[in-house]
Amino acid sequence: MLGDAALTNGVTFEAFNNIATTTKRMIVVLNDNEMSIAKNVGAIAKYLNEVITNPRNNRLYSDMNAFVKNLFGEPAAKFTEKVARDAKGFILPSSFFEYFGFMYLGPIDGHDIPLLEKYLNYCKRSTKPILLHVLTKKGKGLDAAVRNPEKFHGATPYDIVTGESTSNSDKSVPNYQDAMGKTLLKLAQKDPKIVGITAAMASGTGLSFLKKDLPAQFFDVGIAEEHAAVFAAGMACQGFRPVAAIYSTFMQRAYDCAMHDVCLQKLPVTFCLDRAGLSPNDGATHHGLFDISFLRPLPNAVIMQPADEDELADMLYTCVESGKPCFIRYPRGKGEGVQMKENPEKIEMGKAEVLRESDSSATIWALGNMVKEALKAAEAIETELGVKIGVVNARFVKPLDRELLLKQADKNRLIVTVEDHVAAGGFGSAVAETLLAARKKCGVCIIGWPDRFIPHGTDVATLRAQFGMSTTQIMERVKQALQES
């Protein structure tokens, strides 16, 4: 089963390339609804659309009908539609797919179940690879989903009659993706060299604002994150300052390109890694829990994470002005509800922010959305034990604020790190490596997600509690580490 948007991805054609020489019996159903998450883009989408809508192609039905009637008479009329449909399927668009060794059938109505069964049974009897092209309507069966297919691609709880979300979240608080998108638009309005790039995720990454107001500075490359990275590198070579907005989990696809085409070349590309950390409603595949581990070893890379949406705006501005390969990671969903400045400000590269001083017992270095949890844990420990735990908003994974970290290692007997990322190879590992290299004797406690794939969940709080990442569990880990240090 292949979605039509998958035809914008190179891996699909790598598989197609093997069909003629390796496969005798194979059925590929091309589910063509002209959508991935958003509207499809590119040459393949254009080609499929022309196959379906070209008036010359569609006239084949009526022309074949007239031909059969004239040749065989009225009794043959009942067979006309079948003959015309088969002729259309076998003749018109077949050349494209037959180059890959497929016999092409279709397009047919994917919602006509008897017709679909008839074609599938025919495909089963074939001794050669077949591609069956079916046309469907994204969201069919639910009017609200048909009206807004992009919104319902990954739906939160909603009213089945109106289609409106039943979430109780504060609508006055912007999503991180929207805060990023609006900031990018503001920056791009002042500088035509600032451009936004998405891999078929304009709405999901917040680039819909740029698409609407500055379409000439917006580029959708289709579901092809690796191409998005190389495309950004090419634009950077020509003096542009590209911002590529990609989900953290999909950055894995673009890793090689980010390494060789961006970081090795020291090109000024900013990658905005949306859905970094937990993304519970999107399922196990969408948790962004590995990006620090695979990006941290890249020379020339700058990696950061904001504690709130206002800091995200500052980081985006800092990155596009830095002239360096930068990666900003931030979570799914609502921001912290802080007041955002009218205009973003630059942040000093590699500098953390002390939010709470310690009494020389322990300091928590928290990254991004875990800063709030660290503050809660520190306050709870002080209330319970009378011990004042320090808290630092780390901001940067790379370059790490080494100067501040070493000072705090001399002052405290314990350094704790907390991150919305796997513990292995993440921010905590960077802190531990720095302290070990400097021969510091303080204890280190790394709090992050365990070495396993985190499953789908209904909400962040439930998954955090399940895997030892809730505020209470962080507090208990710190207390235990204090006793052992």
PLM region spans:
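Thiamine diphosphate
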Residues: T21-K151, S167-T183, Q189-K212, E226-V230, ...
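Catalytic phosphate/nucleotide-handling subdomain of diverse soluble enzymes
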Residues: F231, P242-A245, Y255-C257
